[in-house]
Structure formats: structure tokens, C-alpha cells
Amino acid sequence: MPETKKKLPKAYGMRDEQDVLSAVRDNGNGISFVRLVFPDILGRPMEFTIPGSELAAAFKDGKGFDGSSVAGFVRIEESDLVIKPDPKSFRLLPWEYRGFDEGIRWREAVMFGDILKPDGGIYEGDSRAALKRNLLRARKEFGFDDFKCGPELEFFIFPSSREPVPADQGGYFFSGRHGEVRKEVQLLLHRMGIATEYDHHEAAPGQHEIDLRYESALEMADIGMLFRYMVKKVCRMHGLYATFMPKPINGQNGSGMHVHQSLWKGGRNLFFEKNGPYHLSLLARRYMAGVMTHAREISGVLSPWVNSYKRLIEGYEAPVYVAWGQKNRSAYIRVPEYQPGKERATRIELRAADPACNIYLALAVMLAVGSEGIRKKYDLVDPVEENIYHMSGTRQKRFDIRVLPRNLEEAVRVMEKSEVVREALGDHVFHTLIANKRREVEEYGRSVSGEFDKQVSDYEIQRYLPIL
């Protein structure tokens, strides 16, 4: 008789708690453990694992953990927190684990969750909750039902985490030997229900990019966390090291996270208007005006590391000036040109964020300042289609072009005065993040005798390369 092909377990797309429990309880699936994942205030993944048999209890009452051990959470005297898994975030990890005993094999799933206080209230230090709160507010106020985002995350591949030596000497669209690493990452993502659009070698030696297909903001933030994990894991399996550090190599382009975004209602893209300027609706233009008006204030969230500002300098295809255009890749925001029949693709592309940011907080502040532009009916300035790096100061003033913060110290100082950012993040996250970044600036200052410059320092390599 022909061998019966084993049915693969359902890997994603769960509707509710019962759907998840059915998948986990199915003995044929071999799902023995579930990883519960959440971000700390810096956007790094925190996790602990529970047996699949404990998942029903976790859905009912949550699972307690010590929050005092997590950056930006609570003090030791008030450390008890609870994570409640989000069933829609369930994804089966696309491999099987094996023990030393060949008879021991198991599979694991991953789930993101909401952080709660012991009394069941929402914990105000939860980055995921901050994004959900901003989504809910904008939906209630403006009536849209989806904030779609599609990030392009760039990263470097090095032989090890000890020093930033590129694993190849390729350039833009170079077809080098690490293309198969990108393909393997994509195939594993596809098995988890995560869609990609394309991959390619980026401009700098050892630099790569895989573009994710747009999704609703909360799901995309979860996907962003999984993406970074998957890239690092696949590279590790190949004896390589992947980093999302914004600027690991002096004299080369840094890594960005360009975020394509649009608002939707009832399956219709609210950013599109057939007869609007650049085919943008009034809502889209006001949204974009809000993002640009508050660009300096959100810089500390989108580019949250000392090293982030070594990327945001002239001459390396990174935005330094707050302006927008269609073909201008030196601008802060780019509006891709409209293609007839592609109304769904109408969007704006914000180019300033870096791939090591807290994605939840980054999307939260983007939506918040865009909403502020809609709420207060901001006017959009004229587009700039020339290279801003080469424009005179007089010409920059004519287009009302402002400069992004030049370093993290300036970014924190500007953010601290921003009421719209404080409201978007909530008091706890806002003040904790500012305090954390001040300590980072002080530590950097001590290591380089108080000087901020454009060169990547040894301190940054030692501090960021192993962790980002």
C-alpha cells in the first residue's frame, strides 16, 4: 500500500481560543509547547514557554511573570504582571525539534499577548497596548477600520557578532551567495502565513532586504518581531550573524525600515482619490502633513539609538530633511507614483525609521501624528523633487524644509516637549523611554568624551552589534 502522507498541522489563521486549543490538543500535530512573546520598551522580544496543556488556563486567567526583570516595565516591589495570549497571533514554528534521544521530538507555536496587571487591568507599560489604544481612538474618531502597513526591513550579514566585517562585497541587486539565505527566510515565513513581496541585496556590502506584504498594523508589528527572529535564526544556522543595527559600517549606507502605510474603510483605500493631487485624497494629504509637522518629535521613537543618527546623514540615501516627493529618495516621505487600476496601492512611504526600533511604538506614533493632521486639518507643503542634499539654505527655506534631529540627545530633548507623542505613548511609556534614552546618551558621552560625531564609534560596535 502507498504510504499515507501525514497531514500538516494548521500553522496560522486561527479565529478564536477554541480554534487554537483544538490545534494544540490534536496529538497528530505534536505541538508540545507554546512560546508567549511580548516586547520590552526597546522593542526587543521577551518570551517564556508554557506546555501546550497550560494554554487553556492562560487564555482564561493569563500567565503570571516577573515584570521587574523586563526593561521599561515595573519596579521590583510591584513586579507581578500577567500575559494573556492573543489567539489571532498564533503561528506554528516551521520546524521540528529533536532531543538527544531520537524518540523525543516536538513542535512549538508562538503567540503574542496583552500584558495585564494582577487585577486584570491593562498594563500601561505594554507597547502592544499602546498601539491598540491608538488604533481604537482613530477608528472611533475617524471611522476607518484598518491601518495597513508594509515595512521594508534592511539588515546586514556578518561572519560573526564580534566585528562588522561584511560577509560579501556585493552592491544593489547583486546576486551573491547569500541570496539563498534570503530565500530560506521567506519560505519559512510563508509556512507561518507571513507573505513577502521580494528580496534583494542592498547597496552596502553585506546588506540585504526582504519586503513584507502589507497587513493591519497590529498584526504587522507582531510579524516584524517574528521577521527579525527568523532572519537571525536562519543566518545562525548557516554559521553567519544578522544584525538590524542601523549603521554598523563607517562609509557605507545604513539600514532603514521604510514603512508604507494607508488608511482603509470597508475594503476601500481612503488615501486614494482619482482627481486629487498626485491621486491623494484630502484625508491622505492631511495625514501626511501631520506626520511631517511632528517629524522631529517622533524621531526619538523611530530612530531610538545613538547609532541611529549615524545613518541619518547626508550622502547615504537616508532622510535628513523633512520634505516629501514622488521620486525623491532623499525626502522624509515618498509617495509612490500612481499606476492606473492600482488604487489599492496608493500609500505614503515614511523613510526615517530604522529596523531596530520598537515597531509597536513606531506605528503608534506614526498613526497618532497622522491623525493629528486629520483632526486639525493641517495643510500639506509643496513636494520637493530635487536632491535636498544639494539645495541651498535659501531654497530649503522656500520649501519650508526642516532638519531632523542630528543625534539622540537632540531627539530626546524635542520628544520630551511633545504633547502628541506623550499622549500617543501614554505617561508610563513616554517617561520611561525618555529616562532610558537619557542614560544611553550619558553612557555614550562618557565613552567618547562627550562628542557626538558622524563616525561609528567602537562603543557603538561593542554596545549594539551583539544585541540589535
Protein language model annotation of sequence segments:
Residues 2-468:
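Glycine-rich, acidic/polar active-site loops that bind/position phosphate-bearing ligands
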